[in-house]
């Protein structure tokens, strides 16, 4: 220890628990300083030594060389600590030049630009003046009245030079005091008496009623409280002393050729010093006021440029017209200190190289080029060479390694044995982007990678590169082996499914191997022994595809071996031989042609029942088998494999006839252009699908034997059906028809590409398809960045979400049920509850047996019990309802998807959630590119069919029978349920208004029976009574217009937005129904039969005609459809997580009640909901052009939509509560990903939602010091209330608020984390004023200060510390 001390190498890092940020007082700045910088000079151009008292002065900042003073009088260690009397430099290590600061005594006070210009301006808020006014004072434009004295001037009033002169003439020189510059602002700030000011503001807040004033007062009061609590003085925001950064942190480097490169900061400091010195001289020489003032303003500008260049006025630029990088720029953005150096560091002991496939590797191995290994493991090789006495010193060892002596290679072999290395492929989108492997030394220069881990790395071998990192310490090696080894990462943390799954060629080989053909040689033979079969195969008595019988030994449930005779093939038996013996893994799982899905299922089963080791061995053997048969099968494909179905021409002719009919209807004015466009696109979508289906049938036909008795099966079909290569979409384009293409704006071009790639495209078709292809390319380029940004925001908001305890013992939970859309179960209940915990005891509904106890994990066996019990909804615990004070508890989170067991404490689930949501986003943007712009839109849903044999139940049934004896739905929220024999809901569908109902309440229906149908492209307006039509408020050219179609010349009446009518009355176009006497007909609900028409409605009837019940009197055309792809989806995901108001958002009803249309107001319609209990109704003002989905007299439930569109998330929270908000966000986000076939567990989305719901807004301050309208952390709020109750005070009330992820990240408790995310200057300004303390609880802030993260293995370390 003493030796270490002697050499002064003792680490001087301090142990600390928290970090506090404050405004530095002038005294503090002086105490940091080692001397004042007086001269702007840097170094002497001849001697290259630093100038005395300059910016690099050795006397102030320390010696340039270790233990050597500047003049050279004292050299070496022995003189340590002596200060040279000649040059004044202390003899010490030169490292102090990175630590010692200097200072500049300013000749005039200067405002700190962050407190002046960072919005909201703190100085102007405190002084209750506008920022513009403060600037005028600081930059010497206007004077401010400090003391009005005997004059009638106001305190704080601004005066120009002329006005000041006039006032002096009027009141006399000494009647009042007015001043200018930073001195006066400093004086005004000094005079503020915070306790009194706080009291005054508080009283004013109580007495004011104006909302704007309240907001302003709350802002000011908050700032005053911050200053009081932090003990900062407001006058410190104006600086008298400027700190100077250590010179090594703003270096001056000599370039070749004698020129110097310098940090911009030196230039900025020089300007400050120059101006400061000039100002001192001017003041000493008693220069005229105007010159001094100008110099002070220039000094202010110089200091502004140093702190934040470009924030105010023109940025200071260098000779090349580039703005200087100021102190703020050093912190800000991707290249700033936080993100470039603190969160992302370069790593030593690493290398990178191209990857090639290594099919003979085991799953835990990678091939490392010898050259790389030799370089990376150098320290280990040196120590071993010395240990074995092969080399006497490190130097000798070094020479041996450089000479690549034979013994070095032997030592290298030993060194790398069981020493894992980390492989990383950029971009690392989720944690499986870095995995550990045991290296095998190989010749060549490329890293060999195991094929099965490619999916996790998203790697392919078309030139991808990977980086290798060496864990050095024993702890790092241990963690790499236990947590990061590829064999320990079999399941994906996003959805709990295996990610180590055979893919591409392996799948193809296994599919080929497990095919069974009819009429093969030796069909029906029986075998009891594999060697016997091999013999038969070798002598060509059978083939690998021959259907045979085989006696196979199998484990039964008791674990006894029983022989079973199976109908199988030799190929399938080869796979069967690899299966681990377990009663749960039956032979039937592989006794079929194995597709990618089947293989994934088998691997999952093996993992669940046999454990990790068995899975790894099984996957490795499968891979080898797959590769072998992919090779020997000789599968390839040529032109003839692309079969063009004969029915193609028929389908196309039919569709073209159909389209002619639509054209005719359009010409006759029966449908609008938009409807025609939609119908045409639908027709072509259906045609493309039919052609594609016929093509698939054709290529899937059982193969015919040829002369050599070798059966052929279509290669393309094999590749697609097995999931090895190519999608249905791509094959459709090869042999069917390319179909519809999208324009660059997402619109579908209504003329499809009829040809396919085999037939070849015409020039016109080629031109049309180029459009879509380019869109794919451009999307990929643009959307990757936005997806990466979404991931970054998600990580930032959730980074401090860590499992901190086993159980928070809450009784709360959320109820989940399967998601059913269009009568189809999209997500079964089982999928939603697997790996979650029960919130209550769950019993069998019939036998009343206990299935699950509260807090028990729902695993696969429990799932079977729940399914057999027929439960359709279950209460589960969720992170949303977890009541842990910090972090989240394991029970509320449930299963760790990557291991399949209960999550362990210290798991960083927030980051995992963010990666699971963000990673597919990036993948999906790149996926458009492979289909080449073909439109991926199916035909619109225009009917609903029964998905089961079941009994019909109709909710909100309101039906009229029209003149054609058809049942027409009149309800806006009609739902059709299908019930099984026990009355459990099997499916449910929403039936839109105006649909024809083909069944009724209580009917028994069979599977595929049509239940209802409707026109998907228009929203009809339908009559409930028969009568005569009367048009009201339809004034030609003002509220209704005859639109003559250019193409057809047929006029139709369309409602237009009515401008203010000349008579001053608002027009509300409507149709009324009259009876025979000419009086308005009354409806059953007691209201008049009148139908309001929204803007854009097309009339279907003429004035004065007689109509029947159920007739359509007007249609509202729906907008033409655009393709739904992830590009539409990613912005939607971002919109949801940012909690933005959707464009054209819906309005939702806040109460149950009846709808009434009130008097319109300007361009708004008034909708009133009257509650059933007769209390005060609620009013909604909606823009006139919007389509109102309710009619007068309709009964709406809380949460029903009044206007079409996506609801605003904040509204859902306010009206429906947290649980429904969460389920809405989860459903919407999942819908986007589901469209692309990506599976993400709900709990990941719930973690993010929990982070969005961290803040509450105070509605009533009670007896606490909280202010109404203040937004604070939920936990903080609970703590304050607990204190208040203890002290016998009334607790405060607050409501939960939803914040977007960006806002949540910026308002996190840790200012270090927030500053490193975005808006660095604003965050730090705020934190400094409030004297914030960072407790270092999250991951990011710990990485920044260089400590172990408090998660994973660092979690316990952090707790013990």
Swiss-Prot record:
Positions bound to Zn(2+) 2: 808, 882, 889, 892
E.C. no: 2.7.7.6
SUPFAM superfamilies membership: beta and beta-prime subunits of DNA dependent RNA-polymerase
GO-annotated biological processes: DNA-templated transcription
GO molecular function, one term: DNA binding
InterPro entries: DNA-dir_RpoC_beta_prime (IPR045867), DNA-dir_RpoC_beta_prime_bact (IPR012754), RNA_pol_asu (IPR000722), RNA_pol_N (IPR006592), RNA_pol_Rpb1_1 (IPR007080), RNA_pol_Rpb1_3 (IPR007066), RNA_pol_Rpb1_3_sf (IPR042102), RNA_pol_Rpb1_4 (IPR007083)
Binding-site list for Mg(2+): 460, 462, 464
Binding site residues for Zn(2+) 1: 69, 71, 84, 87
Database matches in CDD domains: RNAP_beta'_C, RNAP_beta'_N
Cofactor note (record): Binds 1 Mg(2+) ion per subunit. Binds 2 Zn(2+) ions per subunit.
EC category name: transferase
One GO term describing the cellular component: DNA-directed RNA polymerase complex
Catalyzed reactions per annotation: RNA(n) + a ribonucleoside 5'-triphosphate = RNA(n+1) + diphosphate
Record Gene3D superfamilies: 1.10.132.30, 1.10.150.390, 1.10.1790.20, 1.10.40.90, 2.40.40.20, 2.40.50.100, RNA polymerase II, clamp domain (4.10.860.120), RNA polymerase Rpb1, domain 3 (1.10.274.100)
Keyword set, alphabetical order: DNA-directed RNA polymerase, Magnesium, Metal-binding, Nucleotidyltransferase, Transcription, Transferase, Zinc
Listed cofactors: Mg(2+); Zn(2+)
Function: DNA-dependent RNA polymerase catalyzes the transcription of DNA into RNA using the four ribonucleoside triphosphates as substrates.
Quaternary assembly: The RNAP catalytic core consists of 2 alpha, 1 beta, 1 beta' and 1 omega subunit. When a sigma factor is associated with the core the holoenzyme is formed, which can initiate transcription.
Stored HAMAP family: RNApol_bact_RpoC
Family, similarity comment: Belongs to the RNA polymerase beta' chain family.
PANTHER family xrefs: DNA-DIRECTED RNA POLYMERASE (PTHR19376), DNA-DIRECTED RNA POLYMERASE SUBUNIT BETA (PTHR19376:SF54)
The protein's name in its UniProt record: DNA-directed RNA polymerase subunit beta'
Source species of the chain: Rickettsia bellii (strain RML369-C)
